[in-house]
A protein has these predicted regions:
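Conserved C-terminal region and hinge/linker of Rieske [2Fe-2S] proteins, especially
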Residues: 1-122
């Protein structure tokens, strides 16, 4: 087991440590995007619908352990991304984080998407 997996120091030079942190952040952003696209499809296709489960958010709460409020936000953001191709692309390629996407999708529309994406990237 190396130092990173056991919670100890990696011994990496700081620049390498920085590079690994930012690279992994991009991978996490892209993975989150993929997860959101799956959630949107699952909701559209009513994969969560049975005689008990009330909504996709409730299903995420039950099956993925998300707080119900966080689950509702995931579903909202997932559907919003379908209408915002530039923001979607930036998250898909790892450039934009879920936190920023969550914030901009509250107010973004196709007409304001480009300017809000520019703000989010800087």
């Amino acid at each position: 087991m190396d130092g990173a997996s056991s919670g100890g120091e990696t011994g990496l030079p700081l620049r390498e440590l920085e590079a690994q942190i930012t690279e992994l952040a991009g991978h996490l952003n892209a993975a989150n995007y993929r997860w959101l696209t799956l959630i949107a499809e699952f909701d559209r296709r009513k994969g969560w619908s049975d005689s008990v489960t009330q909504s996709c958010a409730h299903w995420l709460n039950w099956k993925c352990g998300l707080d119900i409020g966080a689950a509702r936000e995931k579903v909202r953001v997932a559907h919003a991304l379908a209408k915002l191709p530039r923001i979607s692309a930036a998250m898909a390629n790892g450039t934009l984080s879920y936190a920023k996407v969550r914030a901009v999708t509250r107010v973004a529309c196709p007409e304001t998407e480009e300017i809000l994406l520019s703000v989010a990237l800087h």
